[in-house]
Swiss-Prot record:
It comes from the Eukaryota. Residues 193-216 are annotated as: Disordered. GO terms for biological process: cell division; meiotic metaphase chromosome alignment; meiotic spindle organization; mitotic metaphase chromosome alignment. Keywords: Cell cycle, Cell division, Centromere, Chromosome, Coiled coil, Kinetochore, Meiosis, Mitosis, Nucleus. Component of the Ndc80 complex, which is composed of Ndc80, Nuf2 and Spc25. This is Kinetochore protein Spc25. Belongs to the SPC25 family. Residues 44-106 form a coiled coil. It comes from Drosophila pseudoobscura pseudoobscura (Fruit fly). Acts as a component of the essential kinetochore-associated Ndc80 complex, which is required for chromosome segregation and spindle checkpoint activity during meiosis and mitosis. Required for kinetochore integrity and the organization of stable microtubule binding sites in the outer plate of the kinetochore. Participates in SAC signaling that responds specifically to disruptions in spindle microtubule dynamics. The NDC80 complex synergistically enhances the affinity of the SKA1 complex for microtubules and may allow the NDC80 complex to track depolymerizing microtubules. It is found in: Nucleus; Chromosome, Centromere, Kinetochore.
Amino acid sequence: MTDLKASEGDLSDYYMRLKKIFSNETRLQSREASISKRSSRVHKNILSAKEAIERQERDFGKLQKVLLNRNQELERRFTLGEALAQQLEVTRQRNADMEAQLLRHTTEGRQRSNELMECMHSLKQATGTYINHEAFPARLNGVSVVRADDGDIKLIPFSLDGNDADGLHTLWRSLHTRTDNASKWRKLISDQEVAGASPVTPSGSERPKATSKHSNFMPTSIIEIDLTSPTNDAS
């Protein structure tokens, strides 16, 4: 009887052990399933993260390429800007030089014009001859004031071809040999000699030709009185 009870106790204990083992195994399987699910999710997340990283790397490569192109474009524009700035500075300097040169030429031209106007005024006073400078250089037009022996004043108009050397010399001799303006002529020539000029006055007996060396003296000077500025002295 005692042995039977002992045997029943052993079976009960054995049953409890088996039950505990099955329970532990079930619990382990449940844990394994849970771990497997978690592992699957982690693995899936890792794959997603890897794909996202690859996409970002591709996007970064594209952005890096765009950035490189932009940097190259900026360098080209910067180089172009420097070249344009240098060219602009050269142009400004050239314009400044041209303005200075133009101002100098304008000043010299104005001074020369004033000198010519003074010369023309002196010639008018010395010769009593008034020239229309607007007809130069094609023609020599004007009027000469001549005092006759009886004291009367006559106005003698003239119109000569600018290339007519004989006519210009004839006009020169006519003006130069006028007795009423001889003192003015002497004063004008004296002033020119003092200033370093070398005027040539052909004599009344000379008959200069168109090819004569005298053809470049006073007639040429008359034509060169220019005749770019208006005459301030009315005839």
